[in-house]
Amino acid sequence: MIILITNDDGFGSEGIKLLKEIARNFAPEIWIVAPDTDRSGAARSLDYPVKQSIGIKQHSEREFSVSGTPADCVIIALNKVMNKKPDLILSGVNIGSNVGDDICYSGTIGAVMEGAARSIPSIALSQVYHDKIDWHNTKVFAPKVIAKLVKVGWPKNIVMSVNFPATEKVKGVEFAEQGEYNIDGDLTFTENSNGSFSLNWSREHSGSGSINKIKEGFITITPVKLDFTDYDTLNTMKNSCADEFSSIAD
């Protein structure tokens, strides 16, 4: 097996070093291609269409840092750096959860979406924390979760988002929806001495899903689709709105 590892926290992050150790349980050939700086919140954005150039720095035979986004890293890995297509892409281990609307913002998720778009099984891994990051639950349980996911498989247009709780005891694994945040949470601005502002966004969870399960001490696995289309609404509109829009091009 050949595994490609990337992340959004940057090439030097603790999480990617941990993920390299975890990947050694599965593959003799491991490649790392990750952003040269923290690109958290990059989602699936790309730098290469707008930049004049993107830097690629080789650190060892199979380890590279890139002056681009996590999605850039996957594209560069598959088209420039690697000589073979990987069997699996792992992204993370992210510092903090990827649940609720975070999935839309996450570079960790964006990277695996880039892999899934190329029909490569791809898993994003995230470690929840409160005051201080503790990697214990990821170290213990990630190898088991990855092995099980690889064994059972999943459709090629889906990525797997795995979140490890910060609780002392892990109760088990739950397959759960991403959940929701109250997007209108408290957003505070603190002016700095240089005239810039520090932002703090406090959001409350509303509803069920991964967020609640993680708080309860469960590892959560959420299948995330590349296709954003809401087919129920699409079919409803085709049936109920066609006449309303039929005269627009007349």
Swiss-Prot record:
NCBIfam families for the chain: PRK00346.1-4, surE
Annotated protein name in UniProt: 5'-nucleotidase SurE
Gene: surE
Keyword tags: Cytoplasm, Hydrolase, Metal-binding, Nucleotide-binding
Coiled-coil segments on the chain, per record: none
InterPro entries: SurE, SurE-like_Pase/nucleotidase, SurE-like_sf
Function: Nucleotidase that shows phosphatase activity on nucleoside 5'-monophosphates.
Binding site for a divalent metal cation: 8-9, 40, 94
Keyword Magnesium: no
